[in-house]
Design a protein with these regions (language model features):
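The feature marks the mature, well-folded catalytic cores of soluble enzymes
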Residues: 1-144
Length: 144
């Protein structure tokens, strides 16, 4: 018997049985139960909130209801002007005054309760998202 065969034989003889060490079950991230409810639960676990417009309420009224004390509301969406347009911010010093940023996300990740924002949504002004106090993300349920 060669040394290689001897080593392999020892390994085979000393291998533990698979029943001795049962592997834990791992939840799959891509489960097919990707629902709005699951997204909201995961978002809340991260410290986020789901804000919905009340019946008959226009978007600007919903923002005013949710953020009554905030003065500088920056918008990156065409359906809401806010007090400042994101395109008009040219420096981080200007963004430092922003209380609320309103932006649209192309998709949300149900499994983690997070949303995707890129340079496109932030008009290449990513620093605004880091400096603002609150971010309102518009997200369609079909994009979860």
């Amino acid at each position: 018997m060669t040394s290689r065969e001897e080593i392999l034989a020892r390994l085979r003889n000393n291998r533990p049985h698979s029943t001795d060490y049962v592997l834990p079950s791992l939840p799959l991230l891509g489960e097919r139960t990707a629902t709005r409810q699951r997204f909201e639960e995961n978002l809340k676990a991260l410290g986020g909130q789901v804000l919905e417009q009340q019946e008959g309420e226009i978007f600007s009224e919903a923002i005013a209801r949710c953020f009554p004390d905030e003065k500088v509301i920056c918008s990156a969406v065409p359906e809401f002007d806010g007090t400042l347009r994101l395109e008009n911010i040219t420096s981080p010093q200007q963004a430092d005054k922003v209380d609320v940023l309103v932006v649209r996300s192309p998709f949300g990740i149900v499994e983690t309760g997070s949303v995707f924002l890129s340079e496109k949504e932030l008009h290449h002004r990513n620093f605004v998202a880091h400096l603002t106090q609150h971010i309102v993300v518009l997200l369609s349920e079909k994009n979860l």
